[in-house]
């Protein structure tokens, strides 16, 4: 009897997953057919809000200079950009590399602050420290190994400006910076392409559900303060705050033209450790939000809890 029940349950879950996958795929295909011209529409925005860009860097002296330069060279009014570079508990030359970028003559007069941080809380702790310092209406996050494309910030801002009251955040797409390094990075690149160009696009196009990634996104500064900031020590602070946004009834908009190039693991060991951390962090988020699946609340939260539950249980 038990074995028959488990077999039926397994078959039903497989069919539900297949149908769900087809629905999301159709939604993504419809979206890309509507946006198949790939034109980069760069009209002037009616308003350019000030943005505080935060870069948490822990022992990233190899890549931090390139990333900082890419951020400072973005196509966004320079007087509307504040850059906070955090050398977070570093034992290498990350802090010195940040100072070297700040000293370059082409960035003279730019609003750059470099913090040699010795605090706790991991990435979430860095973001909470940045929240106390930020002067911008929006906070933008880039990991130290994520180089934004020239118009990345412009497209993120453009998307939230379509409805600033509801769209408290927007996120772009990430590409693999070292995709051709070896077989593993090629596989990771294909995974990212499917996840971001199919799943994320399909979810936004059909349900207006967005998910904040770890990098290449902006969020309203005052909104983050209103929910108490990021949860210190959270392994997946991006997923955690995404659920808080949905619980408030606000939206995380997809800026499909905003792109950043991110370094991915090149060895199986580093890949395993990264995915283990993500799985543990997402598992914690699902457990803490599982109650929303059955009670009264936002339907988007229920849908996301159900989706994450199927993945991590």
Go through the PLM ranges and name each one:
Residues 1-47:
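N-terminal membrane-anchoring/stem segments of glycan-assembly enzymes
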Residues 49-52, 82, 225, 240:
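Cell-envelope/extracellular polymer assembly enzymes that use nucleotide-activated donors
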Residues 65, 92-101, 151:
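Acidic helix N-cap motif at the loop->helix transition within catalytic regions
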Residues 69-80:
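Short, acidic, metal-binding catalytic loop of nucleotide-sugar glycosyltransferases
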Residues 78, 87-96, 119-120:
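A conserved acidic beta->alpha catalytic loop
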Residues 102, 106-109, 115-116, 122-132, ...:
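Long helical/loop segments within the catalytic core of UDP-sugar-dependent glycosyltransferases
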Residues 233, 242-261:
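Catalytic donor-sugar/metal-binding loop of nucleotide-sugar-dependent glycosyltransferases
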């Amino acid at each position: 009897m038990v074995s028959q029940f488990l077999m039926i349950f397994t078959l039903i879950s497989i069919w539900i997953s297949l149908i769900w996958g087809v629905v999301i795929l159709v939604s993504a295909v419809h979206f890309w057919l509507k946006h198949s011209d790939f034109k980069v529409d760069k009209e002037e925005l009616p308003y350019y809000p000030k943005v505080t860009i935060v870069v948490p860097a822990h022992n990233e002296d190899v890549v931090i200079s390139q990333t900082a330069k890419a951020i400072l060279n973005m196509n966004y009014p320079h007087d509307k950009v504040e850059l906070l570079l955090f050398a977070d508990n570093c034992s290498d030359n990350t802090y010195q590399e940040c100072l070297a970028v700040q000293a370059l003559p082409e960035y003279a007069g730019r609003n750059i602050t470099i913090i040699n941080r010795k605090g706790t809380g991991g990435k979430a702790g860095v973001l909470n420290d940045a929240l106390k310092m930020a002067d911008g209406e929006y906070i933008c996050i880039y990991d130290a190994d994520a180089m934004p494309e020239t118009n990345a910030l412009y497209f993120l801002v453009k998307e939230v400006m379509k409805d600033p009251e509801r769209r408290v955040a927007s996120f772009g797409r990430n590409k693999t910076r070292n995709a051709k390094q070896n077989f593993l990075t090629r596989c990771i690149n294909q995974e990212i392409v499917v996840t971001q160009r199919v799943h994320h696009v399909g979810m936004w196009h059909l349900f207006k559900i967005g998910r904040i990634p770890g990098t290449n996104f902006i969020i309203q500064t005052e909104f983050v303060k209103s929910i108490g900031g990021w949860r210190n020590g959270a392994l997946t602070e991006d997923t955690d705050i995404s659920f808080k946004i949905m619980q408030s009834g606000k939206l995380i908009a997809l800026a499909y033209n905003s792109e950043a190039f991110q370094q991915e693991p090149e060895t199986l060991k580093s890949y395993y450790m990264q995915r283990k951390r993500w799985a543990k962090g997402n598992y914690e988020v699902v457990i803490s939000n599982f109650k929303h699946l059955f009670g009264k609340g936002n339907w988007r939260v229920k849908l996301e809890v159900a989706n994450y539950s199927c993945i991590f249980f």
